[in-house]
């Protein structure tokens, strides 16, 4: 199962998945990508 949540530290519009993933990794997530019409950085990780 995959859990997803909005990044707490990402500021502004999310234009590059790589930037989002880097911030998510620093927050302890497994990665992340830009999502939705509002281009928010969403972090993902495995969860049970």
Curated annotation (Swiss-Prot):
GO biological process: defense response to fungus; killing of cells of another organism
InterPro entries: Defensin_plant, Scorpion_toxin-like, Scorpion_toxin-like_sf
Entries under SUPFAM superfamilies matching the protein: Scorpion toxin-like
Transmembrane regions listed in the UniProt entry: none
Domain of life: Eukaryota
Keywords per UniProt: Antimicrobial, Disulfide bond, Fungicide, Plant defense
Cystine residue pairs: 3-47, 14-34, 20-41, 24-43
Family, as annotated: Belongs to the DEFL family. Protease inhibitor I18 (RTI/MTI-2) subfamily.
Listed name of the protein: Defensin-like protein 2
Biological source species: Sorghum bicolor (Sorghum)
Taxonomy of the source species: Eukaryota, Viridiplantae, Streptophyta, Embryophyta, Tracheophyta
